[in-house]
């Protein structure tokens, strides 16, 4: 297991590499280069510069998140072959600079969705919050405007250029069966997995967030049965999973420790995002601290499953609360995620030492 920390780059992330380097137990980052438009090839020069900055700070850069999949691939348009070719070249360039895992998603239109970005807790901290009932009567356009207006920082998956043609894109997904989206996904995997196998990269698909359908858009990555279908689409270790405890765990029907054990034993868990959520009702939750008792997930059981079944995976704390007056990108503060790492590392040490006696 390698503990990492997500970093968006010096241009847009208020958290510095020096900050990250000072968190105990962090080996490296899960990187992002969100300034590159979706569908474009990531150049060797840009990747080299990014990785060099990370390495010069004394950190590893072996995982990249969000090499986003162009909407034309998800829709199955003829132009998808152009974007798949760009994607393969990007993978080759990433591998040449030591990248071993790429975390991505196959969510149409929205990468993730919350109804509040700064929900105030009783202790004065703020957190990400979701209430499905609040979507009633709202349009996707309403949600996009409210989300973008709520943050002074760029949001991953909510890049304005991606959402510029929202009406047109939404219309193309209307009445699309889940099986059709899954077939388009198979086409994408069949196009990239040979390159992954050649260069030694493992793809790690991130679950739908939250773990159910929204606005009638087909979604195919939010349950154990969905994950089983995905690993069966292309039977290769290069076609692996990123098990996000908070995304899958937003639906209490998903047994996150069991999912980690099942796919870890298959060798198909390349990465894990570890965070806690607090259930507040049906399809209603807030993102709590990482401490088990603050939320509804058993973080010890999750870490034990990673320890016993996914020991060759990269993990990171996921979203955190805004505490101690910190401001920044919603869900990605320094202080609460650093606390999360300390807690997760404490669990890991306890599990390691308990198994030795």
UniProtKB/Swiss-Prot annotation:
It catalyses: D-mannonate = 2-dehydro-3-deoxy-D-gluconate + H2O. One of its GO terms (biological process) is D-glucuronate catabolic process. GO terms for molecular function: ferrous iron binding; manganese ion binding; mannonate dehydratase activity. Pathway: Carbohydrate metabolism; pentose and glucuronate interconversion. SUPFAM superfamilies: Xylose isomerase-like. InterPro entries: Man_deHydtase, Xyl_isomerase-like_sf. Keywords: Iron, Lyase, Manganese. Its cofactor is Fe(2+); Mn(2+). Catalyzes the dehydration of D-mannonate. Belongs to the mannonate dehydratase family. This is Mannonate dehydratase. It comes from Cutibacterium acnes (strain DSM 16379 / KPA171202) (Propionibacterium acnes).
